[in-house]
Regions:
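Beta-strand/loop-dominated core regions that host nucleotide or nucleotide-derived cofactor-binding catalytic loops
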Residues: 1-90
């Protein structure tokens, strides 16, 4: 998945989890629990992590504030797309 510069800064400088708000594109098919690649605005791989949502869910959630996840999907697996404890920065 591709993330914006704000998400890059939050992950690299603050050690933050990846929130749906920072996702700008979802590519490929994956299910909840799969390890996915996180790419920055220029396409460079920044991290890998275990995703809490599948590709179809994240396609709907990209750019959405965490407090709106349940409104968009009708359910939720938490406020983050990938928790910092489930992520490795490269």
């Amino acid at each position: 998945m591709h993330v914006d510069q704000g998400a890059v800064a939050a992950m690299q400088e603050k050690g933050s989890s990846l929130l749906p708000k920072g996702i700008v594109a979802v590519k490929g098919d994956f299910v909840r629990g799969d390890v996915v690649r996180i790419l920055g605005p220029k396409g460079a791989e920044l991290a890998r992590g275990i995703c809490r949502y599948n590709h179809q869910e994240l396609d709907k959630l990209q750019g959405v504030h965490s407090d709106q996840i349940e409104q968009v999907l009708g359910y939720g697996y938490g406020a983050v797309a990938i928790h910092r404890d489930d992520m490795v920065l490269l």
